[in-house]
Amino acid sequence: MAIIPTTQNKVALYAAGLYGMKLGSATNSAVLFDVQNNPSGVNGVLNGYYAPFASMTSAQVAAIVVANVGIKAGQYGLTAQNVADAVATVTAELNANAPFGKQGETIANVMTDFTNTYESNAVYGAAAKAWNVKIAQAVSYTGNSQFDAAFGEIVTEFRLTGAENENRTGTAGDIVAPMVTDAL
């Protein structure tokens, strides 16, 4: 499932890949405001948001990104060597773009590439598919919640709109909710 590289999707990929966060609507709106007001657009903003990681080596940042996308030994049939190879690939991309100050843009490009081309990859395909589901959920979360949350966090509150406008919370399997039966 390829994800269209809209600004919002690119921001979601970046936030999840580098920061391990899914953005609430307030933070997403602030980021989109920054994008609108930066002459370099979304890439300029993402390069600026890379600043907290500037004191780290490219390999350290790559290890964070690789872990955040779910490439971990023992998951999805991945080995420690698969993880090391992924870290080396991301490290090489960061090193190639570091002299130009484009590490933020590079992270976004790596995330987009992983999202759109790795689902059929024999080694990383299962991780890419799981990542894409999480990104779709993160984009949906952004539109429905004002608060930021750790990427992969399960939302346990859902707003049900009906005659009573009820809010119910709980965990999987313990919620019984009225169904909407109105015809469309």
Regions of interest found by a model, annotated:
Residues 1-184:
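Substrate/cofactor-recognition hotspot
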